[in-house]
Amino acid sequence: MTHIRKSHPLLKIINKSFIDLPTPSNISTWWNFGSLLGACLITQILTGLFLAMHYTPDTMTAFSSMSHICRDVNYGWIIRQLHSNGASIFFLCLYTHIGRNIYYGSYLYSETWNTGIMLLLITMATAFMGYVLPWGQMSFWGATVITNLFSAIPYIGTNLVEWIWGGFSVDKATLNRFFALHFILPFTMIALAGVHLTFLHETGSNNPLGLTSDSDKIPFHPYYTIKDFLGLLILILLLLLLALLSPDMLGDPDNYMPADPLNTPLHIKPEWYFLFAYAILRSVPNKLGGVLALLLSILILGLMPLLHTSKHRSMMLRPLSQVLFWTLTMDLLTLTWIGSQPVEYPYIIIGQMASILYFSIILAFLPIAGVIENYLIK
């Protein structure tokens, strides 16, 4: 008799995706981050749901409602810290996941890669809107500065900004719509993650060697479910350590002051996970140019399948490309540091050089390295 998990209409979908899924036998710990991202998304939705039960999206009461959650609601403080620090862990896993896909050439599964880029953009938009909700100083001014970037669009810019704001400045209407969007977007992310997984299971997983592994596959359960569970335990440990021992380490002290439109903070900056893009934005002296550079810093990932020139899929056996990959990693860390610094010498010039290097590595150096490596292995 066929097992129920193989015959039941719903269970057989789960079975084909998470139990009997044929998986390469040599995938490493770097392949854990997809499941960790799923765990992060579920955690964020659950903690966010409990926060939404007590939060009021109104400019007069938003800040005090956050204070009320932390002081008066049972375990409200830990729910808030898990949610805000969970976002940091989410982006840490997200950037590692993207880095692994670049290193091992998984971007050649273009449908999976493109849905992944869409997920990245939606995640960034959701996180930005979530940062506005506590209605502290950095929330208000961050929202003002970032939404103002749309005014750089020719002809429709000013109208577009006022349409986003729902008025002539960031106010109650803005906060209300940001809360509504911040609440609904994670559910669209679940749907898109389903599409992402469907595309992945059409081709099967890549592996560290970048070779076809059809002849050597093992079932996902129990081998990789145990492996993923260990990763999940480490993730939970990291999140609890961050939320319980140093909950404000990654936040901004200015956000403990209620939003004041008449008092601008000395240095307006977003959360750490947006600092690299913020540094690229600031490195271009022209407003429209900066906005385009900001957009391209993410959308450039979509060009990676087209820029792949090597005969080898993975970078595992390509030393020249490996050097460039780790240079790119350090360049992004440099941009993250620059984004947190004031706009003055020497940070301006370092930011400009790091931005040029970022685009040069992806658009020119990696494709050239691929051609050189092809020549060397002839």
Swiss-Prot record:
UniProt-annotated binding residues for heme b b562: H83, H182
GO CC term, one of those recorded? respiratory chain complex III
Self-association and partners: The cytochrome bc1 complex contains 11 subunits: 3 respiratory subunits (MT-CYB, CYC1 and UQCRFS1), 2 core proteins (UQCRC1 and UQCRC2) and 6 low-molecular weight proteins (UQCRH/QCR6, UQCRB/QCR7, UQCRQ/QCR8, UQCR10/QCR9, UQCR11/QCR10 and a cleavage product of UQCRFS1). This cytochrome bc1 complex then forms a dimer.
The note filed under miscellaneous reads: Heme 1 (or BL or b562) is low-potential and absorbs at about 562 nm, and heme 2 (or BH or b566) is high-potential and absorbs at about 566 nm.
Q: What are this entry's molecular-function GO terms?
A: metal ion binding; ubiquinol-cytochrome-c reductase activity
Membrane-crossing residue ranges in chain numbering? 33-53, 77-98, 113-133, 178-198, 226-246, 288-308, 320-340, 347-367
Regarding protein family, the annotation reads:
Belongs to the cytochrome b family.
Record membrane topology: Multi-pass membrane protein
Record InterPro entries: Cyt_b/b6_C, Cyt_b/b6_C_sf, Cyt_b/b6_N, Cytb/b6-like_sf, Cytochrome_b, Cytochrome_b_C_euk/bac, Cytochrome_b_N_euk/bac, Di-haem_cyt_TM
Q: What is the lineage of its organism?
A: Eukaryota, Metazoa, Chordata, Craniata, Vertebrata
Q: Which UniProt keywords apply?
A: Electron transport, Heme, Iron, Membrane, Metal-binding, Mitochondrion, Mitochondrion inner membrane, Respiratory chain, Transmembrane, Transmembrane helix, Transport, Ubiquinone
Q: Does the keyword Cytoplasm apply?
A: no
What is this protein called in UniProt?
A: Cytochrome b
**Which residues does heme b b566 bind?**
H97, H196
What does the entry list as the binding residues for a ubiquinone?
Answer: H201
Q: Which GO terms describe its biological process?
A: mitochondrial electron transport, ubiquinol to cytochrome c
* Function description: Component of the ubiquinol-cytochrome c reductase complex (complex III or cytochrome b-c1 complex) that is part of the mitochondrial respiratory chain. The b-c1 complex mediates electron transfer from ubiquinol to cytochrome c. Contributes to the generation of a proton gradient across the mitochondrial membrane that is then used for ATP synthesis.
Q: Where in the cell is it found?
A: Mitochondrion inner membrane
Q: Give the Pfam families listed for this entry.
A: Cytochrom_B_C, Cytochrome_B
> Main location per UniProt?
mitochondrion
Q: According to its UniProt record, which cofactors does this protein need?
A: heme b
The cofactor note reads: Binds 2 heme b groups non-covalently.
